[in-house]
Amino acid sequence: MCGILAILNSLEEASKLRKKALSLSSRLRHRGPDWNGIYQSSDSILTHERLAIVGLENGAQPLLNEDETIALTVNGEIYNHEKLREDLVATGKHTFKTHSDCEPILHLYEDKGDDFVHMLDGDFAFVVYNKKANSFLAARDPIGVVPLYIGWHKDGSIWFSSEMKAIKDDCYKFQPFPPGHYFSSKTKEFVRYYKPNWIMGDSPSGVLKSEEQVLPAIKEAFEQAVVSRMMSDVPYGVLLSGGLDSSLVASIVSRHAEQRVEDHEKSRAWWPRIHSFCIGLKDAPDLKAARDVADYLQTVHHEYHFTVQEGIDALPDVIKHLETYDVTTIRASTPMYFLSRKIKAMGVKMVLSGEGSDEIFGGYLYFHNAPDANEFHVECCRRIKALHSFDCLRANKSTAAWGVEVRVPFLDQRFLDVAMNIDPSHKVCHDDQGKKRMEKYILRKAFETKEGEKPYLPSSVLWRQKEQFSDGVGYSWIDGLKENAENEVSDEEFAKRESYFPDDTPTTKEAFLYRKMFEAIYPGKECMETVQRWIPTWGASQDPSGRAQKVHLSTTE
């Protein structure tokens, strides 16, 4: 991942604007420690903090078109860049200057104006600026895998940034940029370009009704999603918790790792053995499960430990990077923050991870309490649309804190087209006769193999019950966080919580403590309003941990 900042149509004197932009951009340098670049016109400026993954030698940004009248700053990856490049070259109108996967955006903008973002298959946030027309376009990927914020300055300028910290002090108003939208200077409005039926509030089309249709469709689409995200010119690995989602990702990567996906597996990969990474408290449930999967897949496995006290000590830094006070997100992000530091120290810049599956397939244990298939589907849609505030935010900012990029194949557009058009009855946690079955049954079933075929995963892993990441790294982690909050927040202080925080008042001491830490770095209502809180729709709402759900207790007693 990279860090981008854009200030457009500013009234600030040019030299002062440049100094300010460079200073603010440095707040994003953790996201892109490899190089930084800047483009400036008379009243607008684009900056870029680069993490080089593809096109290492000549992919520095901002990128410019042939006559240098259009500039582009991008954070993300475009997975269909080869096809886009091929089609653009075939028109005879464009000359590519770099091997960057993002350069097609420039030329699509030249050809199609604002109406091209739907053609991109990838995870991205970008701003493209047209010097001749003094116009711009900003956009964010369909689900919000990559962060982007928009702000408004009192002089009328509009600002964009990968993280809130670069714009919070200068903009009187700012907010997360909505996923699946673009914003054009021509209309100064958000326009939704990503409009599948499920995200627009419609029921699933029900195209895939029988298991005979569903199972191969899931398997094929997901395998393609993983392979496309193996595109890299640097060492990469997989985050492996030992749960279903990360294990499936690791299994598919291991099947394709020996050949370079960049040339469609025509040549041997120079990093053929996959490195897998796991973290937890000693004796945590995830550690043994991850070791078992790594042994089965023959990955080069790296296991790291942390203590509860180390996690508590890191909380202010974690909250600074995450820009949230949501309890669930902070609990899960702290181990990931530690792990990303270890990964970067090994020289690895990119990892694949399993975020998104629980939202798509109803994998959280509270989904066992869904009243019917329709409500189950509605909740899946709601969770996916909120991912940019929770798991996507956690995965991106925890890793980007140390200059590591995370890729999430479950949120591939083509895979979503399949998974969200399955008849919801295949996803619910009981069969047609009302008999209970494990969460994400249909995904697990899709990766079962026939006799004589090499299994993707051992049965013990394929059918292992869900552990929320913050639970799986060690049950005493959450208990330690609660105990710490009890010690840090007095009963008297907590009793006055409404006077401290009249808006979105914390309901637990742990939430109160994180809110205090957040407000110390990001004060004011504008910052607070960028945050959402993760609360289960059914079941225990005061404690979002998976352990608080009765179905978890019934399987562990």
From Swiss-Prot:
<feature type="active site" description="For GATase activity">
    <location>
        <position position="2"/>
    </location>
</feature>
<keyword id="KW-0547">Nucleotide-binding</keyword>
<keyword id="KW-0028">Amino-acid biosynthesis</keyword>
<feature type="binding site">
    <location>
        <begin position="353"/>
        <end position="354"/>
    </location>
    <ligand>
        <name>ATP</name>
    </ligand>
</feature>
<feature type="region of interest" description="Disordered">
    <location>
        <begin position="538"/>
        <end position="557"/>
    </location>
</feature>
<dbReference type="InterPro" id="IPR006426">
    <property type="entry name" value="Asn_synth_AEB"/>
</dbReference>
<dbReference type="Pfam" id="PF13537">
    <property type="entry name" value="GATase_7"/>
</dbReference>
<feature type="binding site">
    <location>
        <begin position="50"/>
        <end position="54"/>
    </location>
    <ligand>
        <name>L-glutamine</name>
    </ligand>
</feature>
<comment type="pathway">
    <text>Amino-acid biosynthesis; L-asparagine biosynthesis; L-asparagine from L-aspartate (L-Gln route): step 1/1.</text>
</comment>
<dbReference type="GO" id="GO:0005524">
    <property type="term" value="F:ATP binding"/>
</dbReference>
<dbReference type="InterPro" id="IPR029055">
    <property type="entry name" value="Ntn_hydrolases_N"/>
</dbReference>
<dbReference type="InterPro" id="IPR033738">
    <property type="entry name" value="AsnB_N"/>
</dbReference>
<feature type="binding site">
    <location>
        <position position="239"/>
    </location>
    <ligand>
        <name>ATP</name>
    </ligand>
</feature>
<keyword id="KW-0315">Glutamine amidotransferase</keyword>
<dbReference type="GO" id="GO:0005829">
    <property type="term" value="C:cytosol"/>
</dbReference>
<keyword id="KW-0436">Ligase</keyword>
<feature type="site" description="Important for beta-aspartyl-AMP intermediate formation">
    <location>
        <position position="355"/>
    </location>
</feature>
<feature type="binding site">
    <location>
        <position position="101"/>
    </location>
    <ligand>
        <name>L-glutamine</name>
    </ligand>
</feature>
<keyword id="KW-0061">Asparagine biosynthesis</keyword>
<feature type="binding site">
    <location>
        <position position="279"/>
    </location>
    <ligand>
        <name>ATP</name>
    </ligand>
</feature>
<feature type="binding site">
    <location>
        <begin position="75"/>
        <end position="77"/>
    </location>
    <ligand>
        <name>L-glutamine</name>
    </ligand>
</feature>
<protein>
    <recommendedName>
        <fullName>Probable asparagine synthetase [glutamine-hydrolyzing]</fullName>
        <ecNumber>6.3.5.4</ecNumber>
    </recommendedName>
</protein>
<dbReference type="InterPro" id="IPR001962">
    <property type="entry name" value="Asn_synthase"/>
</dbReference>
<keyword id="KW-0067">ATP-binding</keyword>
<feature type="domain" description="Asparagine synthetase">
    <location>
        <begin position="217"/>
        <end position="466"/>
    </location>
</feature>
<dbReference type="InterPro" id="IPR050795">
    <property type="entry name" value="Asn_Synthetase"/>
</dbReference>
<feature type="domain" description="Glutamine amidotransferase type-2">
    <location>
        <begin position="2"/>
        <end position="188"/>
    </location>
</feature>
<dbReference type="GO" id="GO:0070981">
    <property type="term" value="P:L-asparagine biosynthetic process"/>
</dbReference>
<dbReference type="GO" id="GO:0004066">
    <property type="term" value="F:asparagine synthase (glutamine-hydrolyzing) activity"/>
</dbReference>
<dbReference type="Pfam" id="PF00733">
    <property type="entry name" value="Asn_synthase"/>
</dbReference>
<dbReference type="InterPro" id="IPR014729">
    <property type="entry name" value="Rossmann-like_a/b/a_fold"/>
</dbReference>
<dbReference type="InterPro" id="IPR017932">
    <property type="entry name" value="GATase_2_dom"/>
</dbReference>
<dbReference type="GO" id="GO:0006529">
    <property type="term" value="P:asparagine biosynthetic process"/>
</dbReference>
<dbReference type="GO" id="GO:0045335">
    <property type="term" value="C:phagocytic vesicle"/>
</dbReference>
